[in-house]
Amino acid sequence: VICYRKYTNNVKTCPDGENVCYTKMWCDGFCTSRGKVVELGCAATCPIRKPGNEVKCCSTNKCNHPPKRKKRRP
């Protein structure tokens, strides 16, 4: 399976045994100014969701699209 791995159109073919694409999002100390931290990648199984985190998993090529960022005000 092919998954996105950064906030660009940067994709990679997952290693053997990793057939799930995931998107993990959470807030850090800069959440109010920068938005949520986003991690994209491949895994053998869907990562476990921790309190305060969002996790989305899928298993088709390029299915973990990077979320759209809000536009900054000038």
From Swiss-Prot:
Cellular localization per UniProt: Secreted
Tissue: Expressed by the venom gland.
Disulfide-bond pairs as recorded: 3-21, 14-42, 27-31, 46-57, 58-63
GO MF annotation, one: acetylcholine receptor inhibitor activity
Protein keywords: Acetylcholine receptor inhibiting toxin, Disulfide bond, Ion channel impairing toxin, Neurotoxin, Postsynaptic neurotoxin, Secreted, Toxin
Main location: secreted
Pfam families to which the protein is assigned, alphabetical: Toxin_cobra-type
GO CC, any one term: extracellular region
Family note: Belongs to the three-finger toxin family. Long-chain subfamily. Type II alpha-neurotoxin sub-subfamily.
Biological role stated in the UniProt entry: Binds with high affinity to muscular (alpha-1/CHRNA1) and neuronal (alpha-7/CHRNA7) nicotinic acetylcholine receptor (nAChR) and inhibits acetylcholine from binding to the receptor, thereby impairing neuromuscular and neuronal transmission.
Protein name listed in UniProt: Alpha-elapitoxin-Aa2d
Organism of provenance: Acanthophis antarcticus
